[in-house]
From Swiss-Prot:
Bias kind Basic residues: ranges: 162-172, 183-218
SMART domains: BHL
Presence of the UniProt keyword DNA repair in the record: no
A Pfam family recorded for this sequence: Bac_DNA_binding
Keywords: Cytoplasm, DNA condensation, DNA-binding
Subunit structure, interactors included: Homodimer.
Stretches for region Disordered: 101-218
Organism of this sequence: Streptomyces coelicolor (strain ATCC BAA-471 / A3(2) / M145)
Protein name, UniProt field: DNA-binding protein HU 2
Function: Histone-like DNA-binding protein which is capable of wrapping DNA to stabilize it, and thus to prevent its denaturation under extreme environmental conditions.
Single GO BP term: chromosome condensation
Length: 218
């Protein structure tokens, strides 16, 4: 049975072929969208549709026997319900004047709309947590870089200040030494002048002796 035959089979119950076609399209569209989003669609007495992730693996090419790597992928999967299995196996007989699939319990169709499965929710939360951790790490790296730059600037400034102070001290020491040398140089000629004056006293002494000698001769 294909889609057109399915529509023909339910057209009488839905009031016409167009209404049946619209109903089939609406059911299939809702089913496909839910499975693609990661939801599990369960129909009581019929089965469930769900999305299954297959990890990367190796397979054999049936024609050449060559080993081929198969990438990670997701596939839809249908699991038949127990009621459906019992009808197919023959353990239960199909009802003649009733619906083959067990009807949904009263009140089950008026509940809240289906939500995303827990697995999908966990994946989304994990992605958000990873993004937040990356942002935090980036901020920490920026802070460390800024701290390193600030420390380098302070160290360089301190080194420059120390160098300036040391240079100033050396300059002051040189100035003091030069002043001391100049003072010593100025004081030295005074000593020489004193030394020069000393012979004058000797000359006076000689003159006095000469005068005394002349007096004696007389």
């Amino acid at each position: 049975m294909n889609k057109a035959q399915l529509v023909e089979a339910i057209a009488d119950k839905l009031g016409g072929r167009q209404q049946a076609a619209d109903a089939v399209d609406a059911v299939l569209d809702a089913l496909v969208r839910a499975v693609v989003a990661g939801d599990r669609v369960s129909v009581t007495g019929f089965g469930s549709f769900e999305k299954v992730d297959r990890p990367a693996r190796y397979a054999r090419n049936p024609q050449t026997g060559e080993r081929v790597r198969v990438k990670k992928t997701s596939v839809p999967r249908f699991r038949a319900g127990q009621g459906f299995k019992d009808l197919v196996s023959g353990s239960k007989k199909l009802p003649k004047n009733d619906i083959a699939v067990k009807k949904a319990p009263k009140g089950s169709l008026s509940g809240p709309p289906p939500t995303i499965s827990k697995a999908a929710g966990k994946k989304a939360a994990a992605k958000k947590a990873t993004g937040a951790a990356k942002k935090t790490t980036g901020a920490a790296k920026k802070t460390s870089a800024a701290a390193k730059k600030t420390t380098a600037k302070k160290t360089t400034g301190a080194a420059k200040t120390t160098a300036k102070k040391t240079t100033a001290k050396k300059s002051a020491a040189k100035t003091t030494t030069a002043a001391a040398k100049k003072t010593a140089a100025k004081k030295a000629p005074a000593k020489k002048a004193t030394a020069k004056k000393a012979p004058a006293k000797k000359s006076t002494a000689r003159k006095t002796t000469a005068k005394k000698a002349t007096a004696r001769k007389k």
